[in-house]
Amino acid sequence: MQNILKKILLTLLLTQVIAAAHAARVELRWYGHSAFKITTPSGKVLLIDPWITNPANKHGQEDLSGIGKADLILISHGHFDHIGDSVAIAKKTGARLVATFDLGKALTHYGGYPLEQSGMDTLGNFGGELTLLEGEVKIAFIPAVHSSTVTKPQDTQDIRDGGNPGGFLITIKNGPAIYHAGDTDLFSDMSLINKFHKVNIMLVPIGGHFTMGPERAAEAVRLVNPEIVIPMHFGTFPILNGTPESLEKALKVIRSRTRVIPLSVGESIEL
């Protein structure tokens, strides 16, 4: 009897090991600037600040045309380089808008985002958390130190209030917790983020001029203490002259153990 039980337990263990080995993983793709695509283990697609056709992406139009599926579009604030191609993608895919309440209202009333693809289930505010995609994804709203205005696509002089800027902490079931910081400077409350959830991956702006540069970004990484940091919002324009190398150097100075993984535009990694 004991031998039979041992065989049953061994079979169950092997089944679990095999299942884990073949389990789908999370894929993260960088399109340049602050634009990312997350594909969950079940195949759901999240786009963050999807300016796919940004100047750093030589294949922007091709990449934009190739997006045939998107379930959620997350927009951190109202500036043109973060709204990006979201309206065109939303109309093509039916993706629902995830944003702060004020930004969501501005985007649907003035920015052209389809009204029926935005609602109370996907709009929130700082301190709040959404559970979406049948529980596979949780999205917490994180403050940022920046600004946020919205302009109509056909009239960039008509400036509208976009609420407060922010970032997102995206927690994926059976996957990592990813913190997209949006456009921001360093702020001390970043140290509170990992008190509520361990951050595995931090997507951090390093370009300077409109956001923090590498040295201040390194201090932000120290406060959040992720396992991995991926630099963003640099090199799109000449004035965004922070570099991943400078970030790595600054992290070494403060003896951070966080691993820097610089991505090339269009590159994907599995997590």
Residue ranges and their predicted role:
Residues A23-V26, T40-L46, E129-A140, T171-I178, ...:
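Beta-strand-turn-beta hairpins that frame and shape the catalytic cleft
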Residues P41-K91, K105, L115-Q117, S147-G162, ...:
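Pre-active-site segment of Zn-dependent metallo-hydrolases
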Residues Q2-V45, I52-N54, A140-I142, V265:
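Zn-dependent metallo-beta-lactamase
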Residues V150-L223:
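Active-site-proximal loop/helix segments of hydrolase catalytic cores
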Residues I48-D49, A70-G78, V98-F101, I178-G182, ...:
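Active-site neighborhood of phospho(di)ester-bond hydrolases with catalytic His/Asp-centered motifs
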Residues N54-P55, F80-G84, G104-L107, G128-T131, ...:
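Active-site environment of divalent metal-dependent phosphoester hydrolases
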Residues L97, T108-L132, A218, R222-L271:
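Binuclear metal-ion centers of metallo-dependent hydrolases, dominated by the metallo-beta-lactamase
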Residues A70, G94-A95, V199, P226:
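Local beta-strand N-terminus motif with an aromatic residue
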